[in-house]
Amino acid sequence: MSTDVETGHYSQSSQVENGAACIPDAISFSESKSSGARFAIMLSAIIIGVTAGTLFNTQMSPALTGMFLALTLVGGFLSTWSPCGYSSLSLLRPAGKYSLGSVARWTPTFITHAIGYAIGAVMLGGALGLVGAFLFEQLAFSHMVIGLAALSIAYGAHQLGFLRMPYPQRRAQVPHDARFRFRSSTIGLLYGYALGMNYLTYVQTPILYIVTGAALLSADVTTAITIIAIFNIGRCLPVAVNFLPVSNQSVQAWLAKWQERAVELDGFLLLSIGAAALTMLTL
């Protein structure tokens, strides 16, 4: 497998394990836009963010909360375009030909997968909340917003290729061989937990770093768990596509088609919301 996580490119060759072929994560991806087009995206994101910040300046608190919650949920969804996102959609599927019966038999797998995400949210969010309560309880709200907004803008520029930012992650996938050793529902739980912890596998979107920072700086265990849980809901929901009569090939092809656009959306959201937050604080 070869990967360039920071630019959103992935490829994985087919392998054979215990006589069963592993489905590649993707075959081909859409092409990146030119630097001029990416600069236009960056500029438009900043302009839209500044405009939104100006318009909602008198309602700063609810506006910031709404924008952050939207960013968190969408960030979880954008994590689908990672090696583990591809793998979960292709490996956690109903067995055999699609039918109401196969979907019913697969439903416990989806449920345990969601439970795994919930456990991950409690563990990661709880840890961040505890550390935050010890270190950042006295941090001013405005300072927190300024720090997260600046980080958001920096990573937005990173996603569009105009700035190099640190990208901490564990370069690992969920274990593919687990499907040869455990029943489907157990695999769903293991995958959900590994992905729900968010830092045990590849990090696709730097929105995760903003979400992590917000959970940490909230200095409250309940708030931190809620923040991570919202992100994990976005990560978990795409697997529900397997309730529909769609082939694995069509899902993988759709993901590959929109791979680069997902990275651009990532950068656009980070830039626009970061710019909006800074604008509201300065007016």
What residue spans do the PLM features occupy?
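Membrane-interface helix-loop-helix junctions at boundaries between adjacent transmembrane segments
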Residues: 65, 74, 94-119, 123, ...
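Functional transmembrane helices that embed catalytic/metal-coordinating motifs
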Residues: 68-100, 111-121, 184-218, 222-245
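Hydrophobic core of alpha-helical transmembrane segments in multi-pass integral membrane proteins
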Residues: 37-56, 271-278
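Final/C-terminal transmembrane alpha-helix of multipass membrane proteins
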Residues: 260-283
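Alpha-helical multi-pass membrane helix bundles of inner-membrane/thylakoid proteins
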Residues: 3-5, 10-34, 55-68, 101-103, ...
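Hydrophobic cores of alpha-helical transmembrane segments in multi-pass inner/ER membrane proteins
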Residues: 74-90, 147-164, 234, 238-242, ...
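Residue-level signature of transmembrane alpha-helical entry/exit and packing/kink sites
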Residues: 38, 42, 64-72, 105, ...
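Helix-coil boundary and interhelical linker segments in multi-pass alpha-helical membrane proteins
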Residues: 59-69, 130-145, 213-226, 281-283
